From Swiss-Prot:
This is HTH-type transcriptional regulator DegA. Residues 1-57 form the HTH lacI-type domain. Residues 300-319 are annotated as: Disordered. The keyword Transcription regulation applies. Keywords: Activator, DNA-binding, Repressor, Transcription, Transcription regulation. Involved in the control of degradation of B.subtilis amidophosphoribosyltransferase (purF). Probably activates the gene for a degradative protease. GO terms for molecular function: DNA-binding transcription factor activity; transcription cis-regulatory region binding. The gene is degA. It holds the Pfam family LacI. CDD domains: HTH_LacI, PBP1_DegA_Like. It comes from Bacillus subtilis (strain 168).
Length: 337
């Protein structure tokens, strides 16, 4: 049978209230008694029931990360950064991967509201009406919420993003500096603020250089290797550009694979630049030039804002914008004339 709080209290020779105070770190308890109870809990492999804590309105010491695709190294590395910091602060972390599915997103929001987690971090676009409504309900419950890598100005949450406009601008400027003007963009569905801002920065750099943009070279696809490879292949078969700006490293690697299948050499025949600077960028062949997002800093900033919010020192929403950085490797080179 599973060990209960009653079993722990009996074995430690204390009241159930005392065990509860040790678990929740509340009330006045001597160090000797606290250590005795903790030793018994360890010996009996007792795990506090977080669901019961949620029902009584107590802290569950759990936070949740809602991400669109945890198999994408960007979100995997982001989750690792947040989890490490959460562990230092005494929190456990739940990870909800929505697979870009609004129905899954809404379902997770409902579950997290019921569990009364102590905070929720969103790394999804939250575009559907149902998701927005569910999120507004969570906000009304006074659950601390924050958003990373996305921006929803009308929602009452802390936001940690990078300067996506600058990132798109730097990517285009790099390719232009190498002599490329026939540049394609491989994006997602274009609905998120991050995508919109990256294309805004890209357009700004092209306009400053006096280079017209071929709208047929702005390709939409799902943020997956398979979809990216398919759409990049169609692009290369139809009207091969001399350079591609992919909106994440997964799509950039997909473009490299599509080029290799067609005997197009990267970077001799085709320059490719990605976005994120995940482990994929280093492992790609050739190693990928990319715009780096400061993933660790994004996770750390999220916890700093959450700490201020949970301590009641700040009620106003805070937006933190971090700078991107161009990382030049071997997937881009001067235009081969």
């Amino acid at each position: 049978m599973k060990t209960t709080i009653y079993d722990v209290a009996k074995a430690a020779g204390v009241s159930i209230t005392t065990v509860s105070r040790v678990i929740n770190n509340t009330g006045r308890i001597s160090d000797k008694t606290r250590q005795k109870v903790m030793n018994v809990m360890n010996e009996m492999a007792y795990t506090p029931n977080v669901h019961a804590a949620a029902l009584t309105g107590k802290r569950t010491n759990m936070i949740a990360l809602v991400a669109p695709d945890i198999s994408n190294p960007f979100y995997g590395e982001l989750a690792k950064s947040i989890e490490e910091r959460a562990d230092e602060l005494g929190f456990q972390m739940l990870i909800c991967s929505t697979d870009y599915d609004p129905k899954k997103e809404t379902k997770y929001f409902s579950v997290l509201k019921q569990k009364k987690v102590d905070g929720i971090i969103f790394a999804t676009g939250i575009e559907s009406h149902d998701s927005m409504s569910a999120l507004e309900e969570i906000a009304s419950e006074q659950i601390p919420i924050a958003m990373i890598s996305q921006d929803k100005p009308l929602l009452p949450m802390d936001i940690v993003v990078i300067d996506d406009v600058r990132g798109g601008y730097e990517a285009a400027k790099h390719l232009l500096s190498l002599g490329h003007t026939n540049i394609a963009c491989i994006i997602g569905d274009g609905s998120t603020t991050g995508e919109k801002n990256r294309i805004k920065g890209f357009r700004q750099a092209m306009e400053e250089a006096g280079v017209p943009i071929d709208e047929s070279l702005i390709i939409q696809t799902r943020f997956s290797l398979e979809s990216g490879k398919e759409e990049a292949g169609k692009l290369l078969d139809r009207n091969a550009p001399t350079a591609i700006f992919a909106f994440n490293d997964v799509l950039a690697c997909a473009a490299i694979q599509a080029a290799r299948i067609r005997g197009i050499k990267v970077p001799d025949d085709l320059s490719i630049i990605g976005f994120d600077n995940t482990i994929l960028a280093e492992m790609a062949a050739p190693p990928l030039t990319t715009v780096a997002q400061p993933i660790k800093e994004m996770g750390a900033e999220r916890h700093r804002t959450a700490g201020r919010s949970n301590r009641g020192k700040r009620k106003a929403k805070q937006k933190i914008v971090l700078p991107p950085e161009l990382v030049v490797r071997h997937s881009t080179s001067p235009l081969n004339t």
